């Protein structure tokens, strides 16, 4: 039961704060928070909510506004009293509202917010839990709330946060309707009485509130008056009540006296200082996203972008749109000119899209609004449908947000397509953000087709320019059924690769994919415009053939069948199979991977991963196929040698050497590069005519490894080693 204290006619009731609220206030007061300024945002936001409510009620009953037509928020600093006052003409609170809302009934968010705070959440999230009012105690030692609701008398709530608060009927100056919050600031928080600081905080957090926020400041100005007027003013001053602050205060700051000889004397004048109340509206700029896009200049968009992002460069492109119907929201999205250096830094909190609800700022890093691959997009989304006290947990479940997200992604893709029409600007965009588009193809199955239209690659026919897959398809030959591509480390490397020899000789265009993310991208992008994407480095490459070519291929298969079997026996588990190649022209052999295995480039990328999964590595790397070129003299001579004696040790050694060299030229790495190097050195010595025995005699201590015998000579000492 509340205690009742009688002060003459006035009845003061004292209430204890509900336990959780008392705990929250204690946490706010006794913990150091660096960003105390958010209290002003919360109080302005509460005022805006109250104004929203009365505006909504007045739609059905206009008489609700009889107690005050103007919907506004006033901020009044008073350095003499050390108070900061916020006044709104919103709906106000009844006595019951005051008692329930400000102390005795804990909001569902109170406990959740305390848990979040103790887990390291930022104090600025307080408003998302519906307990923003208590942030006033970040800066105030005592708070007085005077409020008037249309259905009740004017009441005053007061608390110094000592575990209790008082409520009494207020017979002071009538406020008509609304709420006045008076903060008695702590000694070290007087910065919030300064004009500069208040303006800075309002601009940062509340410049887009839908009601005028006016700052009232007492200022001084000089005024020149005659002596007669000064005497009159002085007489009036003596009569007036000392407490009336609105009358000008007069100080004598000197007089200009003229020579008053004779009767023709001039009036004397004095300069006085008078105090006056200066009013300044702090949020004159109507939120740019609420205006008609046709009325906004590129300069205005540019200024807004810079103030939003702190970028010193102009944006590259902008999309301004609104969605109406069952769901209402407005959005203003920008593409920056450059990618930030930490674009893919997962742990860093991105401040990409600011979320507003009915012009009230909610949060500036809303991950749920946009997929990760579009994390470079900057802008503002203002929803009419989300609740103002939405928390991150609620956002994750919000169906409204899912619809907003879908629309934002759609509009971003529209913006990219529009930008693609301007080749110069699209080139800048693609250099900065191509990885994001490719990540999108990997992650976003719904928009994969639209994203694939935005890709640009160098090809075997594009020269220095990059080309789109649509342009590639338009240049395809009649007999060509697939889009051919190769992945690798650089344009030069893939252009000189053995894999593209036959394809290019036939006049087919090959797409060069040279970024690591391309490997992940093509795993998901199986086809484009009805044409399948085929890697020229994987098994099963089918090139259009005429009857003569088919016949020749069958003959080669029969002719080299025994050699293929022998090579498979020699290489054993190193390869899955050995086949005749239809892709080689000038190279004797190459290593291709199975359709679902990793390419050489992908294997290189995966080996570079610090936290790789070795079990997957073994499985995905095992599928290598050796393809031999039946038209190459090395392969033909090897066939003849094998036909003559399939147990010839030289054949085995040469097969291993061919395989290892093919591994290197196909982009793979060797498991034992030293053994391969020693073989090559031995061949160099033979080529230079250096006698192995001489080298051994000169270096008696440097024993030549037994497992690397010479390539030529007698049968006992002239064979290359056999590698297991």
Curated annotation (Swiss-Prot):
Biased composition (Acidic residues): 225-244
SMART domains: HATPase_c (SM00387)
Organism: Homo sapiens
Consequence of changing residue 226 to E: No effect on the interaction with AHR
Predominant localisation class: cytoplasm
Annotated positions for site Cleaved under oxidative stress: 126-127
List of residues that carry S-nitrosocysteine: 590
Sites where the protein binds ATP: 46, 88, 107, 133, 392
CDD domains, sorted: HATPase_Hsp90-like
TPR repeat-binding (motif): residue ranges: 720-724
Protein name: Heat shock protein HSP 90-beta
Modified residues (Phosphoserine): 226, 255, 261, 307, 445, 669, 718
Span list, region Interaction with BIRC2: 2-214
Chain positions with Phosphothreonine modification: 297, 479
Annotated consequence of substituting residue 255 to A: Increases the binding affinity for AHR. Increases AHR transcription activity
Top-rank taxon: Eukaryota
Gene name of the record: HSP90AB1
Region (Disordered): 222-270, 696-724
Record PTM N6-malonyllysine, positions in chain: 399
N6-succinyllysine PTM positions: 219, 531, 577
Cellular component per GO, a single term: axonal growth cone
Subunit composition and interactions: Monomer. Homodimer. Forms a complex with CDK6 and CDC37. Interacts with UNC45A; binding to UNC45A involves 2 UNC45A monomers per HSP90AB1 dimer. Interacts with CHORDC1. Interacts with DNAJC7. Interacts with FKBP4. May interact with NWD1. Interacts with SGTA. Interacts with HSF1 in an ATP-dependent manner. Interacts with MET; the interaction suppresses MET kinase activity. Interacts with ERBB2 in an ATP-dependent manner; the interaction suppresses ERBB2 kinase activity. Interacts with HIF1A, KEAP1 and RHOBTB2. Interacts with STUB1 and SMAD3. Interacts with XPO1 and AHSA1. Interacts with BIRC2. (Microbial infection) Protein on the cell surface interacts with N.meningitidis serogroup B adhesin A (nadA).
Positions of glycan attachment: 434, 452
Region (Interaction with NR3C1): 9-231, 264-608
Outcome when changing residue 574 to A: Decreases the signal of SMYD2-dependent HSP90AB1 methylation. Highly decreases the signal of SMYD2-dependent HSP90AB1 methylation. Diminishes dimerized form. Reduces interaction with STIP1 or CDC37
């Amino acid at each position: 039961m509340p205690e009742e204290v009688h002060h003459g006619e006035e009845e003061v009731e004292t209430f204890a704060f509900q336990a959780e609220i008392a705990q929250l206030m204690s946490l706010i007061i006794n913990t150091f928070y660096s960003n105390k300024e958010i209290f002003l945002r919360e109080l302005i936001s509460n005022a805006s909510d109250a104004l929203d409510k009365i505006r909504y009620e007045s739609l059905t009953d206009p008489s609700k506004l009889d107690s005050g037509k103007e919907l506004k928020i006033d901020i009044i600093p008073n350095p003499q009293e050390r108070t900061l006052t916020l006044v709104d003409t919103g709906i106000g609170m009844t006595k019951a509202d005051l008692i329930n809302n400000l102390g005795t009934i804990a909001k569902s968010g109170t406990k959740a917010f305390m848990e979040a705070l103790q887990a390291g959440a930022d104090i600025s999230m307080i408003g998302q839990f519906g307990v923003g009012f208590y942030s006033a105690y970040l800066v105030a030692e005592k708070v007085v709330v005077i409020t008037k609701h249309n259905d009740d008398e004017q009441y005053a709530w007061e608390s110094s946060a000592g575990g209790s608060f008082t409520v009494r009927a207020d017979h002071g100056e009538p406020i008509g309707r609304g709420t006045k919050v008076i903060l008695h600031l702590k000694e070290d928080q007087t910065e919030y009485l300064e004009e500069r600081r208040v303006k800075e905080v309002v601009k940062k957090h509340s410049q887009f509130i839908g009601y005028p926020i006016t700052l009232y400041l007492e200022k001084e100005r000089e005024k020149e008056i005659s002596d007669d007027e000064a005497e009159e003013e002085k007489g009036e001053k003596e009569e007036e009540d000392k407490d009336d602050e609105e009358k000008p205060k007069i100080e004598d700051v000197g007089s200009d006296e003229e020579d008053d000889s004779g009767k023709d004397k001039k009036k004397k004048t004095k300069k006085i200082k008078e105090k006056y109340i200066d009013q300044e509206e702090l949020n004159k700029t109507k939120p740019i996203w609420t205006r008609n896009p046709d009325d906004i200049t590129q300069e205005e968009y540019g200024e807004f972008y810079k103030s939003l992002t702190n970028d010193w460069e102009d944006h590259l492109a902008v999309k301004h749109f609104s969605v109406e119907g069952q769901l209402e929201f407005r959005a203003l999205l920008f593409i920056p000119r450059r990618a930030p250096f930490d674009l893919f830094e997962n742990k860093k909190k991105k401040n990409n899209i600011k979320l507003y609800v009915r012009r009230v700022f909610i949060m500036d890093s809303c991950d749920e609004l946009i997929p990760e691959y579009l994390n470079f997009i900057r802008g503002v989304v203002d929803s009419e449908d989300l609740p103002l006290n939405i928390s991150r947990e609620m956002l994750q479940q919000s169906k409204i947000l899912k619809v907003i997200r879908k629309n934002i992604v759609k509009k971003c893709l529209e913006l990219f397509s529009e930008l693609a029409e301007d080749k110069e600007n699209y080139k800048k965009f693609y250099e900065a953000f191509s990885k994001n588009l490719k990540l999108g193809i990997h992650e976003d199955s719904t928009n994969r087709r639209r994203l694939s239209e935005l890709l640009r690659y160098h090809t075997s026919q594009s020269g220095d320019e990059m080309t789109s897959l649509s342009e590639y398809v338009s240049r395809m030959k009649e007999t060509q059924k697939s889009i051919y591509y190769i992945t690798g480390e650089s344009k030069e490397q893939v252009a000189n690769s053995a894999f593209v020899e036959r394809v290019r000789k036939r006049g087919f265009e090959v797409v060069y994919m040279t970024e690591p993310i391309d490997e992940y991208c093509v795993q998901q992008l199986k086809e484009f415009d009805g044409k399948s994407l085929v890697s020229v480095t994987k098994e099963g490459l089918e090139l259009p053939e005429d009857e003569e070519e088919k016949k020749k291929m069958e003959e080669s298969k029969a002719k080299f069948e025994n050699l293929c079997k022998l090579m498979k026996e020699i290489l054993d588990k190193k390869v899955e199979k050995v086949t005749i190649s239809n892709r080689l022209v000038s190279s004797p052999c190459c290593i291709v991977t199975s359709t679902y295995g990793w390419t050489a480039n992908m294997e290189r990328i995966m080996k570079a991963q610090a936290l790789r999964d070795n079990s997957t590595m073994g499985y995905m790397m095992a599928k290598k196929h050796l393809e031999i070129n039946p038209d190459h003299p090395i392969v033909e001579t090897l066939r003849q040698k094998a036909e003559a004696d399939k147990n010839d040790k030289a054949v085995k050694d040469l097969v291993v050497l061919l395989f290892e060299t093919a591994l290197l030229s196909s982009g793979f790495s060797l498991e034992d590069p030293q053994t391969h190097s020693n073989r090559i050195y031995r061949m160099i010595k033979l080529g230079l005519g250096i006698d192995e025995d001489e080298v051994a005699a000169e270096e008696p201590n440097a024993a030549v490894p037994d497992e690397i015998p010479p390539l030529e000579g007698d049968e006992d000492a002239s064979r290359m080693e056999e590698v297991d």
